[in-house]
From Swiss-Prot:
This is Zn(2)-C6 fungal-type transcription factor FTF1c. GO terms for molecular function: DNA binding; DNA-binding transcription factor activity, RNA polymerase II-specific; zinc ion binding. SUPFAM superfamilies: Zn2/Cys6 DNA-binding domain. The keyword Nucleus applies. InterPro entries: TF_fung (IPR050815), Transcription_factor_dom_fun (IPR007219), Zn2-C6_fun-type_DNA-bd_sf (IPR036864), Zn2Cys6_DnaBD (IPR001138). It comes from Fusarium oxysporum f. sp. lycopersici (strain 4287 / CBS 123668 / FGSC 9935 / NRRL 34936) (Fusarium vascular wilt of tomato). CDD domains: fungal_TF_MHR (cd12148), GAL4 (cd00067). Multiple copies of the gene are present in highly virulent fusarium oxysporum strains. Zn(2)-C6 fungal-type transcription factor that has a role in the establishment of the fungus within the plant and/or the progress of the disease. Regulates the expression of virulence factors such as SIX1 and SIX6. The keyword Nucleus applies.
Length: 930
């Protein structure tokens, strides 16, 4: 019988057939293997309800049953998804006919009930035996029942007479969650970023490192032929990195942050060449004030700007307007030109120009450059003179930060902020300008931080640059090596370069002035910032900080080169170099250091264990240094050199406080010397207060101290209990006095306030116009009427002398110099003082304790004793110097205590701290007679 003709057939049955026929049917089906005999289990359900025998099912009915089985979407026939091989299923096993293991009734044959499932022959991907069914049919999955897994129909489907469908899809199984894929990709992306960021030198090390396998592949998603080990970093990323490294650099776009910031900075720097032009004065005033700046300011406070370069650029019009405005603002106070003069005080003349320059500088704090830094330093000095303590303090701090941002504290050969990348070597003048700007910041920090509660910011060991060279070397551009602040020589000269072997000869006034101010900063830190209390050793011991500072001050003056030691010849040499004021200012600072250290030791007399010799030496050094400062100020006045540095005024103030004690001495030589020196200091302070506003306060402080001296002499109180309470007025304390400027009433001279009489008081008694000496000192700002006719008739010689002594107008002298008061005031003061206090006046002329006319003591030069009891120079050549007091100003009987002591002066000086036994000799035949 040819079975090839039966391509498709189905069987129908009524009930269970006999076992013999069923066995024969099974044998028959086993022998029948048609190539097209794929199981068509959809037709079985239709056969169960039809009454047709096997082999009689029409073809049309079969097709209808097949179409009906596809009505439900979940009951599609697997015939369309069957493999191409009709004899194998999707697991690679040969399909068996429906009668192979299960009878038509749905019950398996008893002899094959324990047969091994067909899917057990499959192996897992790892090559192990499969123990679980790989895929269940759709019906078993819906009913949550165990599927036997036979093909073409499982036991459950045969038993239930339902189609058995194994749903096989071509879509790969997705991971349980998307987070697994995300975690797998994240390390790869991080690895790519790291490889892009590493440098070329580190790629060789990374090439030998194998990239880790973060997560194994999901079963069924990776072909078996792909290796499980990943490639190395060099193999995976080597070609890409090589191409990236050799690729040409891309041009920067306009939106790049770095390039945009650079363009903004360049634009701001370009604006400096024209911003502020509208506020500039005329060209004539610019050149005039530039000369005034270099004559009165340059070198005395800071060594800023190179004069030849500045003047050349000024004439060519290539200077930034902000720099010109700054120079004009600070120099306007010293000019006498009618084009610059104003109705206000001299120290406020340049405020209009300073305000424009200040606005320009404060808007550019983000972009540091040397021009803005120089302007900040000069503006800080100007605000110092206008008593704007807050502004000066802030501008100084901003300048210091900007200097460190520009790396001026390092001695570099190239500009570190050069944006061109060319690294052009700096010239000697440019390097010296950078050094001097940094030293100016250092000095400003010392000046501004000298107060009690103002610590210093810049440490000495931070400045790693040489000290400035001599001024003539700087002006002519002659390079020369110098020492650093600690004495080291960074660039020692070689024998064959033609330079001076001794580097100290290359150091001028600027270098030793910096060292003097540095030592002064250490002393103020020791005295006013708590270091004195932390010293474990007493002041008089050699290991104490006090003795160390004293030795440093003395040795610094002794270590000056011969060309810088004070002498008349060296002063003339410095006049030829246009640096006499700088030379005098340096020596004033050196003497002030000795005065400051020695004065602090005088308060330790009553301490336990102090020796009289220690106190005697400290007192001698204090008075000698104070007298020496007055001598230098007098030499400057006679030589026509004006020492305009504000710190020089503070040195004169400190010296004046010592002289105020010497005035009441019972030693005639000390008394006369103190009178002459105090006159010099007070005149100098009155001249300085026209240019620097804070000296109004210092002059009033000297006046108060003198009044305390008079009160102490009258009362005769015991001062030994307050001998250790000596405190000092520091240079930086004016910040607290004038944090935001001073009012008009604080700097206006009393002579400018004219008293106005109302018309209703015309018939009343006239108000008195004169005051006594006691009233003058009691009232810091006395009022008086200024009558031009009376003044001209009473004191014509005073006005003539005033014109000879100063270049300022006579009216300004009368308004600002209380030393030159009228003779009418002096007569009234004489009458009041002699009547109230019993003062015995010698001579016919009236006496004013604030000034003495040249005719008052014609024989003063012949009766003048040496200035100091310790080898002081005679004042025979100062015969016409007006004295602060007459030869015998205190020939009166003051009450004293039983112990002969006097009550305290003020918080600055304690008179008892200077008292000593009258028999104590000073070493030159003179004795103390306080």
């Amino acid at each position: 019988m040819d079975f090839t003709n039966f391509d498709d057939f189905a069987f129908a049955y009524y009930g269970l057939p006999v076992r013999a026929s069923l066995v024969s049917l099974v044998d028959h089906t086993h022998t029948f293997q048609s190539p097209t005999a794929l199981p068509q289990h959809q037709a079985i359900s239709g056969l169960a309800h039809s009454g047709l025998p096997f082999g009689t099912l029409p073809t049309g009915n079969r097709n209808q049953s097949m179409e009906g089985s596809k009505a439900h979407p979940d009951r599609t026939s697997p015939a369309s998804e069957a493999p191409e091989d009709p004899t194998t299923d999707e697991f690679g096993l040969a399909s068996r006919s429906r009668a192979g293991g299960i009878d038509p009734g749905g019950k398996p044959k008893e002899d094959k009930a324990d047969a091994t499932p067909a899917w057990s022959e499959l192996k897992t991907k790892a090559g192990k035996e499969r123990k679980r069914l790989p895929l269940a049919c759709v019906a078993c999955r819906r009913k949550k029942s165990r599927c036997s897994g036979e093909k073409p129909a499982c036991e459950h489907c045969l038993r239930s007479y339902i189609p058995c469908v194994y749903k096989v899809t071509t879509r790969k199984a997705a991971p349980r969650t998307n987070c697994m894929a995300m975690l797998d990709k994240r390390p790869k992306r991080m690895e790519e970023r790291v490889i892009e960021a590493i440098s070329k030198s580190d790629q060789e090390v990374a090439s030998s490192v194998t990239r880790p396998v973060v997560k194994p592949a999901i079963p069924g998603t990776v072909p078996s032929s792909q290796p499980t080990k990943k490639r190395g970093a060099e193999e995976a990323f080597g070609p890409d990195l090589e191409a990236w490294a050799k690729a040409p650099s891309e041009p920067k776009t306009e939106g790049d942050d770095g390039s945009s910031s650079l363009q903004v900075q360049e634009g701001e720097e370009n604006k400096l060449q024209h911003e502020g032009t509208d506020a500039l004065p005329s060209k004539e005033i610019q050149e005039h004030l530039a000369e005034v700046f270099f004559d009165n300011i340059y070198g005395q406070s800071y060594h800023l700007l190179h004069k030849p370069s500045y003047m050349r650029k000024l004439k060519n019009g290539t200077l930034p307007p902000v720099l010109v405005l700054t120079v004009c603002a600070v120099a306007a106070r010293f000019t006498s030109s009618p084009l610059v003069s104003s109705s206000g005080p001299e120290f406020l003349r340049g405020e209009e120009w300073a305000s424009h320059a200040r606005d320009i500088c404060t808007r550019r704090y983000e972009w540091p450059n040397l021009t803005i830094l120089t302007c900040l330093l000069i503006l800080g000095l100007h605000e110092f003179g206008t008593c704007q303590g807050g502004r000066s303090w802030a501008l100084g701090g901003q300048a210091i930060r900007m200097a460190f941002a520009l790396q001026l504290h390092k001695d570099l050969e190239y500009d570190p902020l050069d944006r061109n990348g060319t690294k052009t070597q700096l010239s000697f003048i440019d390097r010296e300008i950078r050094r001097r700007i940094m030293w100016a910041c250092f000095l400003m920090d010392r000046f501004n931080s000298s107060g009690t509660d103002r610590p210093m910011f810049v440490r000495e060991d931070t400045i790693q640059i040489p000290l400035p060279v001599k001024e003539k070397y700087f002006q002519f551009g002659l390079p020369a090596p110098t020492e650093m602040l600690d004495g080291r020589v960074p660039h020692p000269p070689s024998p064959n370069d033609g330079q001076i072997a001794d580097v100290r000869e290359n150091m001028g006034v600027a270098a030793f002035l910096i060292r003097a101010i540095t030592l002064w900063g250490r002393i103020t830190t020791y005295l006013s910032q708590g270091c004195k209390d932390l010293d474990p050793n007493p002041l008089w011991e050699d290991e104490s900080h006090h003795m160390k500072h004293l030795n440093d001050a003395v040795n610094l003056e002794a270590s000056l080169p011969l060309s810088l030691k004070y002498s008349a010849e060296n002063l003339e040499v410095h006049k030829t170099e246009n640096t006499p004021s700088q030379f005098l200012f340096m020596h004033i600072c050196l003497q002030h250091n000795i005065l400051l250290v020695s004065r602090a030791a005088m308060s330790a007399r009553k301490q336990h264990g102090v020796h009289d010799d220690f106190f005697f030496e400290a007192s001698k050094r204090t008075f000698n240094a104070a007298n020496r400062i007055s001598e230098l100020l007098r030499e400057a006045e006679q030589s026509g050199c004006f020492v305009s540095a504000p710190f020089a005024g503070y040195c004169a103030f400190s010296s004046a406080t010592v002289h105020s004690v010497g005035i009441i001495s019972r030693n005639p030589s000390m008394k006369l010397a103190a009178q002459a020196n105090l006159t010099t200091n007070v005149k100098y302070l009155h001249k300085m207060k026209k240019y620097w506003g804070m000296f109004h306060w210092m002059v009033e402080n000297v006046r108060t101290q003198y009044q305390n001296v008079l009160d102490a002499m009258r009362a005769g109180a015991n001062v030994e209990e307050r001998a250790t309470q000596l405190s000092f007025l520091q240079y930086g304390d004016w910040f607290n006095r004038y944090p935001r400027g001073l009012s008009h009433a604080e700097f206006m001279d009393p002579a400018t306030h004219k008293r106005k009489d109302s018309g209703a008081d015309g018939v009343l008694e006239a108000n008195p116009e004169l005051r006594s000496v006691e009233e003058y000192f009691t009232l810091p700002t006395p009022q008086r009427v200024e009558n031009k006719d009376t003044i001209s008739a009473a004191a014509p010689k005073r006005k003539q002398n005033a014109k000879k002594q100063t270049d300022m107008p006579a009216q300004s002298d009368r308004n600002l110099d209380w030393l030159q008061s009228t003779d009418a005031d002096a007569v009234s003061q004489e009458r009041k003082l002699s009547g109230g206090l019993g003062l015995q006046i010698t001579g016919s002329a009236g006496f004013n304790p604030l000034t003495a006319s040249n005719q008052q003591s014609p024989d003063f030069s012949t009766t003048m004793l040496p200035m100091s009891p310790v080898n002081m120079t005679s004042f025979a050549h100062h015969a016409h110097t007006p004295t602060f007091f007459p030869p015998q100003p205190f020939a009166m009987n003051f009450g004293q205590g039983s112990n002969g002591n006097i009550d305290p002066l003020d918080r600055q000086f304690i008179y008892g701290g200077y008292s000593m036994d009258a028999s104590t000799s000073l070493g030159d035949g003179h004795t103390w007679a306080l």
